[in-house]
Regions:
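Short, catalytically relevant binding-site loops at active-site mouths
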Residues: 141-142, 170-173
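Alpha-helix C-terminal capping segments
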Residues: 125-128, 153-157
Length: 259
């Protein structure tokens, strides 16, 4: 059972600005996650092992954030995977008629496998530390298929209390001096995402053209669609923080079960 949902960023300002709004938002997400009683996390990242034409599900029992240009060595995440839950996720995705593949690293025996994970998983899990199943979206699949994937992943949890985290940064073209240059579409995209979260209206994302996210240079749409499917109804949303301190937008939001 999904007991908690979150949109969490994966940008390094969360470490560089420990008193900033994003870091404070992440600490608040951690408090709410603890209060939810979630024993494990299913986390969707846009930067993991991306499979042509398929959703990806990490089956490994151990997770280790690989060295990367965004995260200092002292912040690299080490934690546990959730092989049993991963198998259930794959089973429900298959039965939903969705293309999905399981992944291990180094060995097919999940108990002996340590999967190198990306900053998109490692940064949120540093704050929201739980045994986790890492999943990756697939941009050639439709919005509706991403929602159905979220629904299938929720079914996989059974009666176990599990949280779903959409790791997402938004428009990456807020400044002219960023690595991707300026995009006039980044701010409107981010403004509309904030509005959707405030109104608890993730379902509206289903009608968004993915080209809009691409024009805004955002990596967030697909994970939020999966989150929408996983949550269904019966959750209240709260936007905890938003900022674009560099070239990309970062947002923290919680989705808690209604009493």
């Amino acid at each position: 059972m999904i007991v908690f949902g979150a949109i969490a960023p994966h940008g390094n300002p969360v470490y560089e600005q420990p008193d900033g709004p994003t870091a404070n938002g992440m600490h608040e997400l951690a408090r709410r996650l603890e209060a939810s009683g979630a024993e494990a996390i299913i986390l969707a990242t846009p930067h993991g092992t991306l499979l042509d034409g398929h959703f990806g599900v990490v089956r490994s029992a151990h997770l280790s954030e690989h060295p990367n240009q965004f995260v200092a060595a002292e912040h690299l995440y080490e934690g546990e995977g959730e092989p049993e839950l991963a198998f259930a996720c794959l089973d429900t995705l298959y039965h939903a008629g969705l293309p999905a593949l399981g992944m291990t690293f180094g060995t097919t025996a999940e108990g002996g496998s340590t999967m190198p994970i990306d900053w998109g998983a490692g940064i949120p899990l540093t704050f929201l530390s739980r045994p986790a199943v890492i999943v990756t979206p697939c941009r050639v699949l439709s919005n509706e298929q991403h929602v159905r994937a979220g629904q299938a992943l929720a079914v996989a949890t059974g009666n176990r209390p599990v949280a779903f985290v959409a790791s997402a940064d938004h428009g990456h073209g807020h400044t002219h001096d960023g690595p991707y240059g300026y995009s006039e579409h980044s701010k409107p995209y981010d403004d509309d995402v904030q509005d959707i979260v405030r109104r608890n209206a993730l379902g509206e994302l289903v009608d968004w053209d993915p080209a809009r996210a691409k024009d805004a240079m955002a990596d967030s749409l697909w994970q939020m669609l999966i989150l929408h499917g996983a949550l269904g109804t019966g959750f209240r949303a709260e936007l905890l923080s938003y900022e674009a301190p560099t070239y990309f937008g970062m947002l923290t939001a919680s989705f808690q079960r209604e009493e």
